[in-house]
Amino acid sequence: MASLEIIKLEWATPIFKVVEHSQDGLYILLQGQISWQNSSQTYDLDEGNMLFLRRGSYAVRCGTKEPCQLLWIPLPGSFLSTFLHRFGSLLSEIRRDNATPKPLLIFNISPILSQSIQNLCAILERSDFPSVLTQLRIEELLLLLAFSSQGALFLSALRHLGNRPEERLQKFMEENYLQGWKLSKFAREFGMGLTTFKELFGTVYGISPRAWISERRILYAHQLLLNGKMSIVDIAMEAGFSSQSYFTQSYRRRFGCTPSQARLTKIATTG
């Protein structure tokens, strides 16, 4: 089993920035407050919360003046497959939830979870310990989450992660969301009929293809807006919007301000 690269992060971002994840994993908020957004919901985390997320792009903002401190635990497919196989008999005792897995799940950290996290952090500080100890601590953490009040939802998400058609769809959409195709063209290029494509998409993302594509383009445009000097009209075209006015309307609906206002806020914040 490959070693897992666990990272301790410190973020200071008072305005929403886009965070892209090519892997599924867990965030543990060690200090501060933070908000995560996907296309349909905002998730507010307080110190002591844990967040499970599926691969994808999200908008993130810190809610405190002090930097937020987080621990990122990636969960690659090979690790999860081994985990599910190893503890399959034990996990089969947990009620199955057949609902579409949520892209984000928030867990409140109980005393026993807190102790498990402390033990994991202690091992991470010891370079002389073998990596297998880290893996064992992560497995312990996953088991505790599986037997928590949201365990059925958590396991449902884990079981979907190793699904090859779903992984292929995620890769395909990340590579092609800027294409100006009709939905039937997306389905055809993926190698499916339109109805089957929509059904698979709903299973993976929990929203319609059009809503996901629109959200992904808005996040891409948001990155260009805050991290470059392109004009707003050029950003609109680059991100696949039919006009600047449509982009401005979509941006205001998503972030609560116009692109021009967001850029001015970024300049004022960074000096």
Curated annotation (Swiss-Prot):
SUPFAM superfamilies on file: Homeodomain-like (SSF46689), Regulatory protein AraC (SSF51215)
InterPro entries for the chain: AraC_XylS_family_regulators, ExsA-like_N, Homeodomain-like_sf, HTH-like, HTH_AraC, HTH_AraC-typ_CS, Tscrpt_reg_AraC-type_HTH
A Pfam family hit: HTH_18
PROSITE patterns per the UniProt record, alphabetical: HTH_ARAC_FAMILY_1, HTH_ARAC_FAMILY_2
Effect of I34V: In plasmid pYVa127/90
The entry's DNA-binding region: 184-205, 232-255
Consequence recorded when altering G228C: In plasmid pYVa127/90
Coiled coil: none
Induction profile: By increase in temperature.
GO molecular function, one term: DNA-binding transcription factor activity
Signal peptide (UniProt feature, chain positions): none
SMART domains: HTH_ARAC (SM00342)
Keywords linked to the UniProt accession: Activator, DNA-binding, Plasmid, Transcription, Transcription regulation, Virulence
SS bond partners: none
Domain spans labelled HTH araC/xylS-type: 167-265
Protein task: Transcriptional activator of the Yersinia virulence regulon.
Protein name in the entry: Virulence regulon transcriptional activator VirF
Source organism: Yersinia enterocolitica
Lineage: Bacteria, Pseudomonadati, Pseudomonadota, Gammaproteobacteria, Enterobacterales
Gene that this polypeptide is encoded by: virF
